């Protein structure tokens, strides 16, 4: 069941990563990018904690937020 929900949450991330982000300029302030971070977090921690970490990271990614290398814990 965990794998099903993880895959379900990865689908919109992959859609964004391979369809939408190709049409927009790179704007993520972090390495790895927020979409790659979300993929890594969901695969490593599953749907609950992975989604929490991904949302937390996306909310930090703005002009007044931090920048630089920020790996999945």
UniProtKB/Swiss-Prot annotation:
<keyword id="KW-1003">Cell membrane</keyword>
<comment type="function">
    <text>Could be involved in insertion of integral membrane proteins into the membrane.</text>
</comment>
<protein>
    <recommendedName>
        <fullName>Putative membrane protein insertion efficiency factor</fullName>
    </recommendedName>
</protein>
<dbReference type="Pfam" id="PF01809">
    <property type="entry name" value="YidD"/>
</dbReference>
<keyword id="KW-0997">Cell inner membrane</keyword>
<dbReference type="GO" id="GO:0005886">
    <property type="term" value="C:plasma membrane"/>
</dbReference>
<keyword id="KW-0472">Membrane</keyword>
<comment type="similarity">
    <text>Belongs to the UPF0161 family.</text>
</comment>
<dbReference type="InterPro" id="IPR002696">
    <property type="entry name" value="Membr_insert_effic_factor_YidD"/>
</dbReference>
């Amino acid at each position: 069941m965990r794998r099903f929900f993880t895959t379900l949450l990865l689908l919109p991330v992959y859609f964004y990563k391979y369809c939408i982000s190709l049409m927009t300029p790179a704007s993520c302030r972090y390495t790895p990018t927020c979409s790659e971070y979300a993929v890594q977090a969901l695969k490593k921690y599953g749907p609950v904690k992975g989604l929490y970490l991904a949302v937390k990271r996306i909310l930090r990614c703005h002009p007044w937020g931090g920048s630089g290398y920020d790996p999945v814990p």
